[in-house]
UniProtKB/Swiss-Prot annotation:
Organism expressing this protein natively: Rattus norvegicus
Pfam families: Ribosomal_L24e (PF01246)
Protein name as it appears in the record: Probable ribosome biogenesis protein RLP24
GO biological process: ribosomal large subunit biogenesis
Complex formation: Associated with nucleolar and cytoplasmic pre-60S particles. At the end of biogenesis it dissociates from cytoplasmic pre-60S particles and is likely to be exchanged for its ribosomal homolog, RPL24.
Length: 163
C-alpha cells in the first residue's frame, strides 16, 4: 500500500481517495481534496497559501532539514519479501516516526521560546515607561507624614512633662 502526497498541500492521500490530474506531458498531479484541486486550477502558489505545508516550511514554522525525512523518499525498486526484513522495517519505521515527532516538538518549542523572550523584554520596557501608573507620586510621603506626626506627639508629650 503506497500513501501518496498531495501536490498542493502535501497532505497524505490513501488508496482510493483523492483525484489525479495527468497533464499532456504525462506529469501526474495528485490532490487530496477538491479544495486543493480548485486552488491548483486557479494557479495559486502553495507557498503563498497559508494553510499548506509548503507555506509552513517556507515561513520557518516547521522543520525542513532533517535526516528523518530521508526515510520518506519514494523507492520504486521491488524487494524480495523476507519476513525478518519486513519485521525489522516496521520496527525501524516506528522508531523513525518517534524520533521525528520528538525533533519537531523540540523545533516548535525553540521557535516559541524566542517569542517569550521578546515578550518579556517588551513587558519590562512597558513597565519602565508607565511606572507612574504603578507607583503613586505620594507613595513615599505617607511614611514621612507618619514620622512628623510621631515627632509632634513626642514634642507635645515633652512640653507637658516640662510644664
Amino acid at each position: 500500500m503506497r500513501i501518496e502526497k498531495c501536490y498542493f498541500c502535501s497532505g497524505p492521500i490513501y488508496p482510493g481517495h483523492g483525484m489525479m490530474f495527468v497533464r499532456n506531458d504525462c506529469k501526474v498531479f495528485r490532490f487530496c481534496k477538491s479544495k486543493c484541486h480548485k486552488n491548483f486550477k486557479k494557479k495559486r502558489n502553495p507557498r503563498k497559501v497559508r494553510w499548506t505545508k509548503a507555506f509552513r516550511k517556507a515561513a520557518g514554522k516547521e522543520l525542513t532539514v532533517d535526516n528523518s525525512f530521508e526515510f520518506e523518499k519514494r523507492r520504486n525498486e521491488p524487494v524480495k519479501y523476507q519476513r525478518e526484513l519486513w519485521n525489522k522495517t516496521i520496527d525501524a519505521m516506528k522508531r523513525v516516526e518517534e524520533i521525528k515527532q520528538r525533533r519537531q516538538a523540540k523545533f516548535i518549542m525553540n521557535r516559541l521560546k524566542k517569542n517569550k523572550e521578546l515578550q518579556k523584554v517588551q513587558d519590562i520596557r512597558e513597565v519602565k515607561q508607565n511606572i507612574h501608573l504603578i507607583r503613586a507620586p505620594l507613595a513615599g510621603k505617607g511614611k514621612q507624614l507618619e514620622e512628623k506626626m510621631v515627632q509632634q506627639l513626642q514634642e507635645d508629650v515633652d512640653m507637658e512633662d516640662a510644664s
